[in-house]
C-alpha cells in the first residue's frame, strides 16, 4: 500500500485512500494528528499527537518535541535568523557536524535531538498507525512540503524518510496537492484556480489550471514565516493580559489553538476555560476580538496572494481555501473581498485533509494507478554562479519537475567548485544556497567539463560532471541510532486498561448484564443486540469534544 502524507507544522495526516476523511487514518479519534512527540524520562518508548500533548499537560516527567517542520533548512549560517523569527521556548543549537538539534518542553533532563530524528520518529509512528488501521504494509509514500521550500529544505523530509527505509515516490507542494484533490473530484475545466494554503507554520498559494486529465501548476508564491502558530502566539499575549494567575506560553499555546477553532465554528462563544497554576480561570474572548488579532496576519497573507494575482490580471480567479488557518472567518472574508476573486471554495468537511488526499492522488498518478497527470513546476529559479557573482540560470522559475539540463564549461586544471543558488535576486550570493560540491581534476591543465544538472520528483538537485556524480556538501546530516533506541507506544494500551473496566461497569449497570471483556465484540449475540455503536452514531455526539476532554 502506498500513502500520501501531509506533514504539517501543527497537524499531520496520512491518507491511504483519496476519499476524504474516511480515507485517512485516525489516531486517538482524529485524522488530524498533532505534529509532536513526547519521550518520558528514562523510557525507551515515545508518544505522538494527542497522547504526547496529554502526557506533557499532565506533568509526566519527560520532554515534548514540537514544531520540527519549522526548522527545516536551518544551518549554521542562518540559525540566528530563524531563532529571531520563530522565538522558540526550547533549546536550539547546531552540533559540531552541522546538524540542527532541538530540545523539548517539560521537565527532567533536556535531551537534544536532531530535527531529522524527530521528523522520522513522528512519521514512523504515523505509518505504524496506518498499517494497524488498514492491516496493510506501507511500501512507499508521497510527502507534501510548502510551495516555497527550496531543494535543501525538502531534503530534510527526504532524509527523515530514508531513516524509515520507505521509498519516496515524490515530494509535492502542499497547495498543489490540495488542488489535485479538489480537481480530481470535480468537473472544473479550463478555469484558473488559486489554492490558498494557510497552514500552521507556512503560507503558500499555487495557481493551477486543468485541461482534461492534465493539471498544470503555473505559478507559486508563499511565506515560510507566516502561519497559524504566529496567530496562536498573538492570542497567547492577549490571554496573558486577561488572566490573573501564572501560565507558561507553551501550555497556553496548546489551549488557544482550540479556542481559535471554537470561535471560528461558533461566534456566540465568549467564555473560555484557561488552565493556570493551581486551577483554571474563565476568560472572555469574543469573535470580534479574534478578528482583530487575526487581521494583521491575514493582511500579510493577502499581500503575498496579491503578488501572485497580479500576474494574471484581469483574469478572474477561483480561490480554493485549505490549511487550518483558512477556517478563520476573517481570513476567508479578506480573500473574498479581493476584486479579482470570482468565488471562494471552502469545504468544511475536507479542507483540512485535502493536502494528504492530494498527496495520495499524486502517489497513485506516479504509480500509474490514476488517469490524472500533474505538470508540477519549480517555485524558484536555480542558478549557477560562474564569475563575478553573476548568476547563470540553470532552471528558470516555472520549469517542469522533473527536468534535466546539460552545460559545457571551460575549466582550469584544479578542482572545480559547483554551486547552485535558489531565488530571484540578480546577485547569486543573495539567494539561498542549495548545492555545493567539488569536482576533482585529473589530467590536462585546461579541459572541458560536461555538467548535467538534474531536478528530481522529490525536489532535490543533483549534479553529474563528466559522468561522475558530485557530492552535495549541503546534504542534511542523516538520522542517528536514536531511532533504534525508541519504540512507538500508541497510548491505546494504557487507555484501554483504564477505560474498559469503567465501560463494563457502566454497561452492566445500565442494561442489568454481567458482561466481561470476552463479550465485547459483535460476535457475541448479547452484546450485539444492544446496538451500541448504531445508537451512538444516531446520537450525533461530537467525538472530538469528548476526546479533548
Swiss-Prot record:
Keywords: ATP-binding, Chaperone, Nucleotide-binding, Virion. It is found in: Virion. One of its GO terms (molecular function) is ATP binding. The keyword ATP-binding applies. InterPro entries: ATPase_NBD, HSP70_peptide-bd_sf, Hsp_70_fam. GO terms for cellular component: virion component. It comes from the Viruses. Its main location: virion. SUPFAM superfamilies: Actin-like ATPase domain, Heat shock protein 70kD (HSP70), peptide-binding domain. Coiled coil: none annotated. Transports viral genome to neighboring plant cells directly through plasmosdesmata, without any budding. The movement protein allows efficient cell to cell propagation, by bypassing the host cell wall barrier. Two movement proteins, p6, Hsp70h and three structural proteins, CP, CPm, and P64 are essential for cell-cell movement. Also plays a role in virion formation. Together with CPm and p64, encapsidates the 5'-terminal portion of the viral genome. PANTHER family: HEAT SHOCK PROTEIN 70KDA. Belongs to the heat shock protein 70 family. This is Movement protein Hsp70h. It comes from Grapevine leafroll-associated virus 3 (isolate United States/NY1).
Amino acid at each position: 500500500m502506498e500513502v500520501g502524507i501531509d506533514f504539517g507544522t501543527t497537524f499531520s495526516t496520512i491518507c491511504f485512500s483519496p476519499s476524504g476523511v474516511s480515507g485517512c487514518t485516525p489516531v486517538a479519534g482524529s485524522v488530524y494528528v498533532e505534529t509532536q512527540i513526547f519521550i518520558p524520562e528514562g523510557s525507551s518508548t515515545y508518544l505522538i499527537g494527542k497522547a504526547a500533548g496529554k502526557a506533557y499537560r499532565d506533568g509526566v516527567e519527560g520532554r515534548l518535541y514540537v514544531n520540527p517542520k519549522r526548522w527545516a533548512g536551518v544551518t549554521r549560517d542562518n540559525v540566528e535568523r530563524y531563532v529571531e523569527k520563530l522565538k522558540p521556548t526550547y533549546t536550539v543549537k547546531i552540533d559540531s557536524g552541522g546538524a540542527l538539534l532541538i530540545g523539548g518542553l517539560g521537565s527532567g533532563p533536556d535531551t537534544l535531538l536532531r530535527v531529522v530524528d524527530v521528523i522520522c520518529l513522528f512519521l514512523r509512528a504515523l505509518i505504524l498507525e496506518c498499517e494497524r488501521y488498514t492491516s496493510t504494509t506501507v511500501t512507499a509514500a508521497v510527502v507534501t512540503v510548502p510551495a516555497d521550500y527550496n531543494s535543501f529544505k525538502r531534503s530534510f523530509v527526504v532524509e527523515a524518510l530514508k531513516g524509515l527505509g520507505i521509498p519516496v515516490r515524490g515530494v509535492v507542494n502542499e497547495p498543489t496537492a490540495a488542488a489535485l484533490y479538489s480537481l480530481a473530484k470535480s468537473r472544473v475545466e479550463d478555469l484558473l484556480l488559486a489554492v490558498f494554503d494557510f497552514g500552521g507554520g507556512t503560507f503558500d498559494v499555487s495557481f493551477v489550471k486543468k485541461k482534461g486529465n492534465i493539471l498544470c501548476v503555473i505559478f507559486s508564491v508563499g511565506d515560510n514565516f507566516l502561519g497559524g502558530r504566529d496567530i496562536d502566539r498573538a492570542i497567547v499575549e492577549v490571554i496573558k493580559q486577561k488572566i490573573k494567575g501564572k501560565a507558561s506560553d507553551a501550555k497556553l499555546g496548546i489551549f488557544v489553538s482550540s479556542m481559535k477553532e471554537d470561535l471560528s465554528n461558533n461566534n456566540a462563544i465568549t467564555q473560555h476555560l484557561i488552565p493556570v497554576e493551581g486551577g483554571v480561570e474563565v476568560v472572555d474572548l469574543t469573535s470580534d476580538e479574534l478578528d482583530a488579532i487575526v487581521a494583521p496576519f491575514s493582511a500579510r497573507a493577502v499581500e503575498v496572494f496579491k503578488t501572485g494575482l497580479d500576474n494574471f490580471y484581469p483574469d478572474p480567479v477561483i480561490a480554493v481555501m485549505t490549511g487550518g488557518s483558512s477556517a478563520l472567518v476573517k481570513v476567508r472574508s479578506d480573500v473574498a473581498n479581493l476584486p479579482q476573486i470570482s468565488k471562494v471554495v471552502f469545504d468544511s468537511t475536507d479542507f483540512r485533509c485535502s493536502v494528504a488526499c492530494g498527496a495520495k492522488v499524486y502517489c497513485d498518478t506516479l504509480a500509474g494507478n490514476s488517469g490524472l497527470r500533474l505538470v508540477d513546476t519549480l517555485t524558484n529559479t536555480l542558478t549557477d554562479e560562474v564569475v563575478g557573482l553573476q548568476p547563470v540560470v540553470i532552471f528558470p522559475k516555472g520549469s517542469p519537475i522533473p527536468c534535466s539540463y546539460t552545460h559545457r564549461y571551460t575549466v582550469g586544471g584544479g578542482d572545480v567548485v559547483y554551486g547552485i543558488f535558489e531565488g530571484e535576486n540578480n546577485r547569486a550570493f543573495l539567494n539561498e544556497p542549495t548545492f555545493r560540491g567539488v569536482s576533482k581534476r585529473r589530467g590536462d591543465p585546461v579541459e572541458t567539463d560536461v555538467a548535467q544538472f538534474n531536478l528530481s520528483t522529490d525536489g532535490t538537485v543533483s549534479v553529474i560532471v563528466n559522468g561522475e556524480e558530485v557530492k552535495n556538501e549541503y546534504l542534511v546530516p542523516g538520522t542517528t541510532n536514536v531511532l533504534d533506541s525508541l519504540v512507538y507506544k500508541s497510548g491505546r494500551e494504557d487507555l484501554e486498561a483504564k477505560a474498559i473496566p469503567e465501560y463494563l461497569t457502566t454497561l452492566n449497570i445500565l442494561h442489568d448484564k454481567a458482561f466481561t471483556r470476552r463479550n465485547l465484540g459483535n460476535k457475541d449475540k448479547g452484546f450485539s443486540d444492544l446496538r451500541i455503536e448504531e445508537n451512538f452514531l444516531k446520537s450525533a455526539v461530537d467525538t472530538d469534544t469528548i476526546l479533548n476532554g
